[in-house]
Amino acid sequence: MITILGAGGGIGSELAKLLIDRKQPFRLVSRSPGAVPGATETVSADITDQGQTIRAVAGSRIVHLLVGLKYDHRLWAEMWPRVMANAIEACKRAQARLVFFDNVYMYGKVNGPMVEETPFSPCSKKGEIRASIANAS
């Protein structure tokens, strides 16, 4: 089973379409998931709650973490560490691979191409938060 945490956003919607086209079974997880023709399952869960996250991920082999939070660095500082910890713990228990779609805030201003080895050099609070999460994971 492929699970999409944060299925209500633009990236989750596009991934769901791709999985439908490929006839892959998948589970959509969000606080209030809508019916999606072709989705194997829909699950309502608050992934800031560890128990709900563990239940939502149970039985998965791949979990896509595509959650979006309100664009506020104070909220990010409070919620992202919890969301990430819950997703990692749930994937460990399910023995699932975690795919995290991240942004580039942690890199700051980069001259030239960005590659996997590009060092973190955040230039904002949001960037510092994302770098700390990436370094802790």
Go through each PLM region and give its residues.
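Hydrophobic alpha-helical segments typical of transmembrane helices
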Residues: 15, 30, 133-136
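SDR active-site strand-loop-helix element
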Residues: 5, 29, 66-67, 100-103
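Conserved Rossmann-fold NAD(P)-dependent oxidoreductase catalytic core, especially the SDR/UDP-sugar
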Residues: 25, 85-132
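N-terminal Rossmann NAD(P)H-binding glycine-rich loop of SDR-like oxidoreductase domains
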Residues: 2-24
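Conserved glycine-rich Rossmann-like NAD(P)H-binding loop of the short-chain dehydrogenase/reductase
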Residues: 24-31
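Short, well-ordered alpha-helices that flank and scaffold nucleotide-derived cofactor binding pockets
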Residues: 17-21, 89, 135
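NAD(P)H-binding glycine-rich loop region in Rossmannoid oxidoreductase-like domains
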Residues: 34-94, 107
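Short, contiguous strand/loop micro-motifs
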Residues: 2-3, 73-75, 120-124
